[in-house]
């Protein structure tokens, strides 16, 4: 499995972020491939990663580590979340007015049924 979740821009912004945006390789290897959980009931789907900036949250349930394309839950405004696809490389490279998107280093894989944010 090849991972291209690092670019020169991401490395530079990581200095602002104060930590690596990208999760450890062992963690990435445990995330199901895109479409792998289509038949899994929503309550049983596992969020493997959590990213945030201000009130915005992104939860990763499936990932293509070669392209950075992820499937998951994104809530950019409170109460306005939806399931869909987003690109982790694009999120990692965002830097607007000193704000960046951060990876929640304390987040453990969690089923939807246990994520109060998604209920």
Ranges and model annotations:
Residues 19, 49-50, 59, 84, ...:
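Short non-domain terminal segments
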Residues 27, 64, 112-113:
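A generic structural signal for solvent-exposed, polar alpha-helical segments
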Residues 48-66:
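Hydrophobic/aromatic-rich, well-ordered segments within soluble, folded domains that form packed cores
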Residues 81-119:
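Helix-rich interaction surfaces within compact, conserved domain-sized segments
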Residues 61-95:
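Acidic, aromatic-enriched beta-alpha/helix-loop junctions
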Residues 1-54, 117-119:
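N-terminal domain-onset segments
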Residues 23-26, 56-62, 88:
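Proteins with a high burden of low-complexity, intrinsically disordered sequence enriched in S/T/G/P/A and R
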Residues 14, 28, 79, 99-100:
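Short linear sequence motifs
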């Amino acid at each position: 499995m090849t991972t291209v979740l690092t670019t020169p821009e991401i490395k530079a912004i990581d200095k602002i972020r104060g930590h690596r945006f990208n999760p450890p390789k062992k963690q990435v290897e445990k995330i199901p491939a895109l479409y792998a959980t289509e038949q899994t009931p929503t309550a049983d789907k596992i969020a493997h990663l959590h990213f945030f900036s201000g009130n915005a949250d992104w939860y990763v349930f499936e990932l293509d580590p070669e392209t950075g394309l992820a499937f998951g839950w994104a809530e950019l405004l409170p109460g306005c979340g939806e399931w869909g696809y987003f690109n982790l490389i694009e999120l990692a490279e965002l830097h607007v007015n000193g704000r960046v998107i951060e990876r929640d280093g304390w987040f453990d894989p969690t089923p939807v049924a246990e994520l109060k944010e998604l209920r």
